[in-house]
Design a protein with these regions (language model features):
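Conserved post-catalytic alpha-helical subdomain immediately downstream of the catalytic base
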Residues: 109-124, 132, 140-203
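Short, conserved phosphate/pyrophosphate- and ester-handling motifs at nucleotide-, phospho-/glycolipid
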Residues: 2, 84, 153
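Beta-strand scaffold of nucleotide-dependent catalytic cores
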Residues: 8-11, 136-139, 160
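Active-site-adjacent beta->alpha loops and helix N-cap segments on the catalytic face
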Residues: 41-47
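Conserved N-terminal subdomain of the carbohydrate kinase-like
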Residues: 1-34, 200-203
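Glycine- and other small-residue-rich loops at beta-strand/loop junctions that grip anionic moieties
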Residues: 37-39, 63
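Conserved phosphate/ATP/ADP-binding segment of small-molecule kinases
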Residues: 47-135
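Short gly/ser/thr-rich secondary-structure transition/capping motifs
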Residues: 14-20, 60-67, 141
Length: 203
């Protein structure tokens, strides 16, 4: 778009048939692992994957993108919830937050639905987060000229999950996610623009 934001067209196709059977047959999560789920597959598959991951003691990150009505029981059992500001508003049935301060309140409200940790991404305004009784705002980073925003959200989620798996506190993991997303926009494409973990994490 002229604003510099990307436009995404989704055709569910094979996503609608996703099953966790292959994962059950070949993957054995460790308690330190983070299993990442997202909303482009059936909620039934996500619910099964969450139960499977928890049976190994692993934690589950749900990236509720695109936003859709979600079973309260699934939300309550989610360890880490990641949404953008539009998805946050839709999930709560309210307008998207208009400022980082409003977004902190929204993150707290989403935390009240059950997830232990919540990140609300705000594009050029960084992200708001809530974890336990704490909440805050992580500013965006400008590392250079933005070339292509495609995949920035996925890079952010991946780095957040990796940082959590390494045992980082949630606010530091959010900062790593922001840095990964900010790095991803510096080059065209999705996966080719992703940076290796050492480049996006802070010691």
């Amino acid at each position: 778009a002229a604003s510099g934001e990307n436009t995404i067209i989704l055709d569910a196709g094979a996503n609608a048939t996703v099953s966790i059977t292959p994962a059950k047959a070949s993957l054995f999560p460790a308690p330190s692992d983070i299993v990442v789920l997202q909303a482009e597959i059936p909620e039934r598959a996500n619910a099964e994957a969450l139960a499977w991951a928890h049976s190994f003691g692993a934690r589950v990150l749900l990236n509720l993108a695109p936003a859709r009505p979600t079973d309260p029981a699934l939300m309550a059992r989610t360890d880490i919830l990641v949404v953008n500001e539009t998805e946050a508003g839709l999930t709560l049935g309210m307008p998207a937050p208009a400022s980082p301060m409003e977004a902190i309140g929204v993150a707290r409200a989403l935390r009240g639905l059950g997830p232990k940790h919540v990140m609300v991404t705000l594009g050029a305004d960084g992200a708001a987060w809530a974890s336990g009784s704490e909440a805050g705002h992580c500013p965006a980073l400008t590392l250079g000229e933005a070339v292509d925003t495609t995949g920035a959200g996925d890079a952010c989620v991946g780095a957040l999950a990796a940082a959590m798996a390494l045992g980082k506190p949630f606010d530091e993991a959010v900062a790593d996610g922001i840095r990964a997303g900010s790095t991803a926009v510096l080059a065209p494409g999705a996966a080719p623009s992703y940076a290796a973990l050492p480049r996006v994490t802070r010691a």
